[in-house]
Swiss-Prot record:
Disulfide bonds: 62-68
Name the record gives this protein: Ranatuerin-2Pa
Residue ranges annotated as propeptide in the record: 21-39
Tissue: Expressed by the skin glands.
Originating species: Lithobates pipiens
Entry annotated with the keyword Hydrolase: no
Amino acid sequence: MFTLKKSLLLLFFLGTISLSLCQREADDDQGEVQQEVKRGFLSTVKNLATNVAGTVIDTIKCKVTGGCRK
């Protein structure tokens, strides 16, 4: 009976460690996903700002030179 208790205790201990490691890894994966989403969002904002700035510069250049085509 004592041997059975030791075996069950060992299995419980190993299962607890395994579960803890899986939970920690899942938390790390969620952090990586959030970083990728932030990176994608910032990239979109940067591209939008670049396009708007280019359009504004073209409009100003057109008005200054007076050579606008419509």
